[in-house]
A protein has these predicted regions:
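Residue(s) in the substrate-gating loop at a strand-loop-helix junction
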Residues: 19
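ABC ATPase "signature
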Residues: 10, 23-24
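Amphipathic alpha-helical dimer-interface segment in Rossmann-like NAD(P)H-dependent oxidoreductases
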Residues: 1-8, 49
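Active-site helix of classical SDR
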Residues: 36-37
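C-terminal helical subdomain
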Residues: 53-56, 60, 76-118
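Active-site loop immediately N-terminal to the catalytic Tyr-X3-Lys motif
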Residues: 24-31
Length: 118
């Protein structure tokens, strides 16, 4: 893990891109995918706490469906028009990175549509 190296600088930002499926379980999503995204969110929180006193800030960004080739051809997935654009996620990452040390975002769900959970 990079944490020991970042601690030496007394400053750092770690952004993990998880998923809204790391915040809930849906029957239409693979258990393995959901499990990995839950683990990534949990690891982000553990790393955030472990690095806090060394000036390290960690954020788990949890987007909904993003308009990439990954989702093409999967039945039951939102249409391209309903998905988040990759640029939206990039802008969000840029914003989180611009925050001062005393304004830490632990996790940030980004929905592309009305969600009943999160």
């Amino acid at each position: 893990m990079c944490l020991p190296h970042i601690k030496k600088t007394n400053y750092g930002r770690i952004i993990n891109i998880a998923s809204t499926d790391g915040k809930r379980y849906r029957e239409s999503v693979s258990v393995g995918y959901s499990m990995v995204k839950h683990a990534l969110v949990s690891m982000s929180h553990a790393t955030r706490i472990a690095g806090w006193n060394d000036g390290i800030r960690v954020t788990a960004i949890c987007p909904g469906a993003v308009d990439t080739n990954l989702l093409n051809g999967i039945p039951g997935v939102t249409t391209s028009k309903q998905r988040l654009k990759p640029e939206t996620i990039a802008h969000t990452v840029s914003y989180v990175l611009s925050l001062p040390k005393n304004a830490s975002v632990a996790e940030l769900p980004i929905n592309a549509r009305v969600e009943s959970t999160i």
